Regions:
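C-terminal amphipathic/interface module of NAD(P)-dependent oxidoreductases
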Residues: 159, 163-182
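NAD(P)-dependent short-chain dehydrogenase/reductase
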Residues: 7-13, 35-93, 98-109, 123-125, ...
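Non-catalytic, hydrophobic alpha-helical segments
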Residues: 101, 105, 120, 131, ...
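Conserved Rossmann-fold NAD(P)-dependent oxidoreductase catalytic core, especially the SDR/UDP-sugar
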Residues: 1-24
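Active-site helix of classical SDR
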Residues: 25, 29-32
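Residue-level signal for the nucleotide or nucleotide-sugar donor/cofactor binding architecture
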Residues: 17, 23-24, 64, 93-99, ...
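Catalytic Tyr-x(3-8)-Lys segment
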Residues: 18, 85-92, 171, 175
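C-terminal "lid/loop" region of Rossmann-like NAD(P)-dependent oxidoreductases
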Residues: 84-88, 115-118, 126-133, 140-159, ...
């Protein structure tokens, strides 16, 4: 979840009690959403559960990170693109399948305590470059890659690994789909 910003490796996996340090406009918007949820819970007793979702794969997601990689591989296989472009491949993420993410949201509604924040994410982590290499290995053609400076973030968050113990305790949720099934 972008709300935590760049964390020290000693603070991984990231717990819900970690300070919120958004490092991009997108992260600020997610942090604001989280804090508004808290405000509406405390001010108006609205049943708001604050979820902090980490990276998930979705074939219909816009051209971000993993979805962009998959789309580019498909285009290269069809001869519509010559090389795969990417940003920072050294970042580390926990990645889950969109179906696991949606099931987690449903379980949060059913079992989590209003006002509380819950991390939702994978139980394993992968370097973005390793993820890309695994995806390329599934391709039927040779794929050349190139770092595009326009895809490098000014303030990149390089380590996003959640502690999902609190969410698991409330819901018994854990990811069911593997990388290969996503």
């Amino acid at each position: 979840s972008e709300v935590y910003g760049q964390v020290d490796p000693k603070d991984v996996p990231i717990k819900e009690t970690a300070p919120l340090k958004p490092a991009s406009p997108y992260a600020v918007s997610k942090t604001t959403q989280d804090l508004l949820g808290w405000s509406y819970f405390t001010s108006y007793q609205m049943r708001i559960i604050r979820t902090r979702m980490f990276t998930y794969l979705n074939p219909r997601r816009v051209d971000l990170f993993a979805s962009s990689f998959a789309k580019q591989v498909a285009w290269i296989e069809r001869g519509l693109q010559k090389e795969l472009t990417h940003g920072n491949l050294d970042s580390i993420r926990s990645i889950i399948d969109m179906r696991d993410a949606m099931r987690a949201y449903w379980l949060a509604i059913l079992h989590c305590r209003p006002g509380e924040a819950y991390n939702i994410g994978g139980t394993t982590s992968v370097k973005v470059g390793d993820f890309l290499n695994r995806l390329i290995a599934l391709s039927s053609v040779t794929i050349n890659t190139r770092c595009d400076p326009n895809l490098l973030r000014p303030a990149d968050v390089t380590l996003q690994i959640p502690c999902i113990d609190k969410f698991y305790k409330e819901t018994k949720w854990e990811p069911q789909y593997s990388f290969e099934e996503s």
